[in-house]
């Protein structure tokens, strides 16, 4: 899901990005449109109309924009927005978002002129203004909302120079605009993941692994879809070298005894998390009640979790272990991330056990 990776293992990503031989790919399996409010889209589309009227979306004047040009240089929108971040220029950030929204509208609705773009944006605004908050949007509006979240994901990894070609948006079909979504299906939800494994040949796969019986939510269904793809991939080649990293973020935590690898978190890591989250996940900064434990942003909740986990480790090792450590990294550590490293067989076994538990819960609920 969008923002799960940074909220779970951003400091570990910081370490991996620094290795020049690593090739990183970030796959977001769900559209995430449910997390984008009508009010946010309305405001952003009004801003986009203002930029078009002021002649500030020059790409609309490209000779072949409406035929194919709109589909070129999606990464320019990311660079444009992040230039605004570096300059602390809100106007340019909003203009960068406007460029992306114009591309999105062009891809979904296929307008043939600037005038048709403007008319379509106005139609979407009217539709959303007449829609009761929380009701199910049309498939086109769901796609538009989802593509806004996809832009956010490209922004956060753009901080590292990761190109948009390495940020993959799978939009798996089980994720729908309903409270209870469908179970993953092989051809619809598992094969797209398997195709990515075949193409990129990863040696490490990371995902959220929430505890057993935590509920048939998005994390659980994504886990089952990934497990299905890994299982199919294991039939095609030897995966003994592949590692699966499980992590948790703002909803659940590992007990220290469950963790196989504990990642140190520095103040620099915390700054990167906070800044990139607030500047990238623009629809989520004001998310209501992200946690029952803390009334703040998701990134605040993640930071609080990592700091609390540091205190747990200090109870075992003592504060002096870090204060007087010869390692600059450990001396600078102010948080900890717990992760679980698994072989492919271990991961598949855990997924199957979790599936059996959930089937049992469903059967009890049907009694």
Q: For each predicted feature, which ranges?
A:
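Metal-dependent de-N-acetylase/amidase catalytic core
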Residues: 8, 15-16, 26-367
């Amino acid at each position: 899901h969008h923002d799960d990776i940074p909220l779970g293992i951003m400091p570990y990503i910081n370490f991996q990005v620094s290795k020049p031989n690593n090739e990183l790919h970030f796959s977001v399996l769900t559209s995430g449109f449910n997390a984008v409010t009508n009010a946010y889209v309305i405001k952003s589309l009004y801003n986009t109309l203002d930029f078009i009227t002021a002649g500030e979306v020059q790409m609309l004047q490209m000779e072949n924009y409406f035929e194919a040009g709109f589909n070129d240089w999606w990464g320019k929108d990311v660079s444009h927005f992040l230039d605004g971040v570096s300059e602390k220029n809100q106007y340019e950030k909003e203009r960068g978002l406007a460029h992306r929204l114009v591309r999105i509208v062009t891809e979904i609705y296929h307008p043939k002129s600037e005038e048709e773009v403007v008319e379509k944006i106005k139609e979407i605004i009217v539709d959303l203004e007449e829609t009761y908050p929380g009701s199910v949007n049309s498939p086109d509006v769901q796609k538009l909302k989802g593509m806004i979240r996809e832009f956010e994901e490209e922004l956060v990894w753009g901080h590292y120079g990761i190109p948009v070609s390495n940020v993959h948006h799978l939009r798996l079909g089980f994720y729908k605009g309903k409270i209870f979504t469908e179970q993953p299906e092989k051809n619809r939800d598992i094969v797209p993941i398997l195709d990515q494994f075949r193409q990129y040949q990863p040696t490490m796969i990371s995902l959220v692994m929430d505890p057993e019986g935590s509920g048939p939510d998005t994390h659980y269904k994504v886990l089952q879809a990934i497990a299905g793809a890994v299982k199919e991939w294991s039939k095609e080649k030897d995966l003994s070298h592949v590692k699966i990293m499980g992590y948790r973020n703002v909803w659940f935590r590992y007990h220290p005894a469950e963790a196989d690898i504990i990642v140190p978190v520095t103040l620099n890591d915390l700054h990167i998390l906070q800044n990139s989250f607030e500047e990238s996940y623009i629809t989520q900064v004001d998310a209501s009640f992200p946690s029952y434990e803390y009334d703040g942003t998701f990134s605040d909740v993640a930071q609080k979790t990592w700091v609390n986990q540091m205190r747990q480790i200090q109870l075992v090792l003592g504060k002096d272990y870090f204060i007087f450590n010869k390692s600059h990294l450990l001396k600078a550590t102010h948080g900890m991330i717990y992760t679980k490293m698994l072989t492919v067989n271990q991961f598949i076994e855990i997924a199957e056990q979790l599936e059996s538990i959930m089937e049992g819960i469903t059967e009890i609920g049907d009694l």
